[in-house]
Amino acid sequence: MLRKIRMILAGVFFVLITLLFLDFTGTLHHWLSWLAKIQFLPAVMALNVVVVVALLLLTLVFGRIYCSIICPLGVFQDVLARFRRKKNKYSYSKKVKWLRYPVLAVFIIAAVAGIGSLFQLLAPYSAYGRIATMIFQPVWKFGNNVLAEIAERADSYAFYSVDTWMRSLPVFIIAAVTLVVLFVLAWRGGRTYCNTICPVGTILSFFARFSWLKIYFDEDNCKNCSMCSKNCKAACIDYKNHKVDYSRCVVCGNCIDSCKFGALKYSSRASKSRESSEASPVDTSKRSFLLASAMVAGAAMAQKKEKLMDGGLAELEDKVAPARQTPLTPPGSLSFQHFAQHCTGCQLCVSECPNEVLRPSSDLMHLMLPVMSYEHGHCRPECTRCSEVCPAGAIMTVDKEEKSSIQIGHAIWIKKNCVPITDEVECGNCARHCPAGAIEMVPLDENDEESPMIPAINEAACIGCGACEYVCPSRPFSAIYVEGHEVHKKI
């Protein structure tokens, strides 16, 4: 019963949070963004005391069910482990302290020292976010585009095509390597990653030792058949000595389900004898129901591209991102420092951005940190999706009115790239598309009536949305680009 309830809850959580990363329509984040905000590390970074305390209390009562049900990377390992069809494939192994605790120490040092790349690399939720965003979402979009093409031939527009492109090759490689490592570890040893590398698993293991409900042996009923140990994906059951390493147990229920002699119980205390066990039988179904109720209640509480516009003025070739002195971060991130200190690199904002403005940074100093660039779209003033889904408080929630008054950067004009000068043609795309009215066209030479019109930028009114940079027909470098601000301003 415990195993079935765990599998149902884990399946629901995993499917929903995966859909949250895959969704490019903007419809699911209103309903599912709370799933990201109940993840342990994002809640810590957001100083969400309610969620952190709730998860710790959940661990103190039920054990490490966070790792077994809520964490998408943990459930994903269970999915990968199923590719190894061999039954009774696990065995007991001692905890790997020499690796487990040093990894946690490095993780904490990276968090305190602000070494974002290392912190994001080890964070479990962020690791799954990278895999979902960099690998799963492009495949999902490709499938959608195939359906859109088929539907269009049938005069149906139930689907629409979306662009797929490589947001960051280094981050894609990191995601692919992570996926391969997870597959090998899960295929060979189940939850090896959770109990040797994952810092969240190590933190929760300290509390799981003292959980109220645990897996206990009834030594009178145990036949030492080893089936429990062979089905324990955490490799934490020493059947010979009738002991369970509760710091590694993820309360999956596999051991109870595989035991034919009723020698394992999920209860608040160990059975002392056969007589006491028979006199007071342990009703695991009630505890399983309690577990399910707690998870459902906790979930309920947590919930309270346009085409290139070249105008025929330039060849259709890909734009090259300018070398910005200060990276652009989304409105609501307050400053680059605040964003870098709080971001866990889960890439949820990247996957949710409807205009594909956000992408993981390829800069070694800020690798995997989402930054903005305008080769594929601009940041629409009315869109606040990234601030709504950010689980770590790196992007504070802003409404449409507030966003329109936040200056994340300002536009800079590059004379040598501007087509009215280089090609002697009229343009004005940047001025026509500026939502803030911060650009007007003025003659290059006021004394010449035939002088080409060039953009004049009012930096005080510019909000840094990038509409001008995106629609600029100059290739490969735009004649106008947005330079970021270290600290965002209100205008």
Over which residues does each language-model region extend?
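Non-ligating segments of multi-cofactor redox enzymes
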Residues: 1-242, 247-248, 253-491
